[in-house]
């Protein structure tokens, strides 16, 4: 069996894949790090990747920049190819927009909610 490849999308020149990247490496995955903000292209198909992670960063999914729109649209490729996807902060906003959701400030004007523990619910559950 070949080594798994995780596509990691980050938004700053010196961004790290952090604990997620570390855990994926510990489990034998190779990381393919891309930065669309610096005009790095994302694959049209996920044939050579086993999963995708889009990280956070300074922008909002509501920003009207070409690379933000490109990433939001690109998520459809991951979903179409039925690959696991993890959106962290901005990445979660992008997934919500891709699926037709709305991104807005909270009523208390807080910027983020902080850490939240995710628990696997099993394979094959569709959104």
Q: Which residue ranges define each predicted feature?
A:
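Helical cap/lid subdomains and adjacent loops of hydrolase enzymes that gate the active-site channel
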Residues: 15, 22, 113, 125-126
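Cysteine-nucleophile active-site neighborhood
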Residues: 54-125
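N-terminal beta1-alpha1 cap of cysteine-dependent amidohydrolase-like domains
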Residues: 1-66, 70-83
């Amino acid at each position: 069996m070949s080594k798994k490849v995780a596509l990691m999308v980050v938004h700053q020149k010196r961004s790290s894949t952090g604990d997620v990247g570390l855990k994926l490496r510990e489990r034998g995955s190779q990381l393919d790090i891309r930065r669309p903000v610096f005009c790095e292209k994302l694959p049209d198909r996920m044939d050579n990747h086993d999963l995708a992670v889009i990280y956070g960063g300074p922008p909002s999914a509501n920003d009207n920049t070409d690379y933000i729109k490109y990433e939001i649209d690109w998520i459809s490729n991951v979903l179409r190819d039925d690959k696991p996807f993890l959106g962290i902060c901005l990445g979660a906003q992008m997934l919500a927009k891709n699926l037709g959701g709305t991104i807005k400030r909270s009523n208390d004007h807080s910027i983020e909610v902080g850490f939240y523990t995710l628990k696997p619910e099993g394979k094959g559950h569709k959104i």
